[in-house]
C-alpha cells in the first residue's frame, strides 16, 4: 500500500495532481481543501495517501494531513459512500466543518453537496457520529487538528479562470448548469481560478 508520497509537484489541475518521485509520476486525486494547501509547481510536496484497487483501475487519493485521510477512510466505510463521494464531501467543506455538521445533525448543509440526498445525509449523521467520537478521542478531542489553516497565495490571473472553475466543479459532480451559475454569481474581475472555485463552492452551501 502507498501511504505517503514526497516528491516534485509536476502538474496541478484541480482536483488532480501529478507528483514525481524516484523517476515515477503518481496521479493523485485530492479534495480541494487539501489541494489549496499544496506548494507551487516544481516544488517539493508531501502528502498522505489512500490507495484504492478496483477491477478497472488503481487510484490514489491524497491529503495534506493524516487527520483528513482518517476522516476520508471513515467516510468510505459508510453505506452508500464511495471514494468519489467522500472526495466531493471533503471538497465542499473542511474536515472541521463536517465534524460540526455531524455534531449538530445539520442535514440541510449536507444535502447541498452534489451526490448527497436526504437519505445519504441521514445515514452519514447516524453512522459517522460514533466513528467521529473515536477519531476525536484519538486526536485528544482537538477539533483544530481537523481544520486546515490555508496559507494559499493566489496564482497569477489567467484568462481561463472561469473555465477552470467550471471544470473543477464538474469533476466534483455538479451539473453544468449548477457549475456555470455558481461561477457566474461570484466571479469578479481579477479572480484567479482557485479563488473562484472556493467562492463558487461556498455560494452553494
Swiss-Prot record:
Location of the region described as Flexible linker in the Swiss-Prot/TrEMBL record: 144-156
SUPFAM superfamilies hit by this protein: DNA helicase RuvA subunit, C-terminal domain, Nucleic acid-binding proteins, RuvA domain 2-like
Region (Domain II): 65-143
Stretches the record annotates as Domain III: 157-205
Record keywords: Cytoplasm, DNA damage, DNA recombination, DNA repair, DNA-binding
GO biological process assignments: DNA recombination; DNA repair
Protein family (similarity comment): Belongs to the RuvA family.
Subunit structure: Homotetramer. Forms an RuvA(8)-RuvB(12)-Holliday junction (HJ) complex. HJ DNA is sandwiched between 2 RuvA tetramers; dsDNA enters through RuvA and exits via RuvB. An RuvB hexamer assembles on each DNA strand where it exits the tetramer. Each RuvB hexamer is contacted by two RuvA subunits (via domain III) on 2 adjacent RuvB subunits; this complex drives branch migration. In the full resolvosome a probable DNA-RuvA(4)-RuvB(12)-RuvC(2) complex forms which resolves the HJ.
Protein name: Holliday junction branch migration complex subunit RuvA
Amino acid at each position: 500500500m502507498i501511504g505517503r508520497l514526497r516528491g516534485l509537484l509536476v502538474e496541478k489541475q484541480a482536483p488532480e495532481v501529478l507528483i514525481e518521485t524516484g523517476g515515477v509520476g503518481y496521479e493523485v486525486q485530492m479534495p480541494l481543501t487539501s489541494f489549496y494547501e499544496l506548494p507551487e509547481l516544481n516544488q517539493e510536496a508531501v502528502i498522505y495517501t489512500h490507495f484504492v484497487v478496483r477491477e478497472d483501475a488503481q487510484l490514489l487519493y491524497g491529503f495534506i494531513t493524516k487527520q483528513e485521510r482518517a476522516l476520508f477512510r471513515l467516510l468510505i466505510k459508510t453505506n452508500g459512500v464511495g471514494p468519489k463521494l467522500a472526495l466531493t464531501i471533503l471538497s465542499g467543506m473542511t474536515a472541521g466543518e463536517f465534524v460540526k455538521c455531524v455534531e449538530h445533525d445539520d442535514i440541510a448543509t449536507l444535502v447541498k453537496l452534489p451526490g448527497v440526498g436526504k437519505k445519504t445525509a441521514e445515514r452519514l449523521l447516524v453512522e459517522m457520529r460514533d466513528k467521529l467520537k473515536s477519531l476525536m478521542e484519538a486526536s485528544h478531542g482537538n477539533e483544530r487538528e481537523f481544520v486546515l489553516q490555508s496559507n494559499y497565495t493566489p496564482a497569477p490571473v489567467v484568462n481561463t479562470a472561469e473555465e477552470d472553475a467550471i471544470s473543477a466543479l464538474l469533476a466534483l459532480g455538479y451539473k453544468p448548469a449548477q457549475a456555470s451559475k455558481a461561477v457566474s454569481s461570484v466571479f469578479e474581475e481579477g479572480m484567479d481560478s482557485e479563488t473562484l472555485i472556493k467562492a463558487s463552492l461556498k455560494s452553494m452551501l
